[in-house]
């Protein structure tokens, strides 16, 4: 009898212990089964301390602020160079780079100040799309203007190119924004805040592959038979620019493909490419195409003109895009020296103005 009582007591105690431990055990199991946000997803929405400022927004804000301050510092000399040359292409690029830096700053600041409400999320995504619109417009403009430099003769032709790129960029951004707002990607949601997903994994993959093919084709153009039929930019920086964007889109496409097959590590790839693109694309444009133009020292004051009256839509003397050397005796290598060869262009303008001034003095 005593043994039975002892066994019964032990059984009751064991059951009580199981009952007591069951909620804790269940909670631990539930915590394990809950999808813990990946560190690359956590980076996109985690706040700094108790503030509403996210690490991601701060990472994107700092480079844009620094670059904008640099543009302001260079503004006086840049305006002087633009007034001297009256080049619509360089003026347009400079304005677009300025706008991209401003929009990037505005997007980050607004995202830092809004709450996690649905309206704030939509506003944040719209700002992302506006930024993407300007970046893509510059992308397309650089490619088209770079490849068609030898065929652009007036301001009106440059305006037509910009209009076409604006329409294409708008169509892309509207499509991406519609997918992003109406059909958000569930894989890019965290807590009560839906992360900007660039139109979703599948749209991201398709667009990345498309742009990778475009930029890869631009890079290999000088190796194709087309080099004998069309004038190609020979400035190395043009192809370096295209190569960088090709690699960027390749990595972004691989990351998107991993996300499409539910491999969350792909998010780390697209995080890196997104940060590089939205933070350093505008500086890349400046270094590749505008640095030489604004940084070259003028050889002479450009205040002498041989002609006083000019028509309203005067031909623009654009820097020539020379064909890649392919004949005997033209030992210029694979990429030589002029895509948008701004230094040589300014030298030509200076020599032309100097010769005109000397001619007038001789006549007097």
From Swiss-Prot:
Bilayer topology term: Multi-pass membrane protein
Signal peptide: none
GO cellular component: plasma membrane
Subcellular location: Membrane
Keywords linked to the UniProt accession: Glycoprotein, Membrane, Transmembrane, Transmembrane helix
Alphabetical GO biological process terms: G protein-coupled receptor signaling pathway
Ranges annotated as spanning the membrane: 58-78, 86-106, 133-153, 161-181, 202-222, 244-264, 275-295
Residues glycosylated per entry: 4, 17, 30, 33
Gene Ontology MF annotations: G protein-coupled receptor activity
Protein name in the entry: Transmembrane protein adipocyte-associated 1 homolog
Species in which this protein is naturally found: Gallus gallus (Chicken)
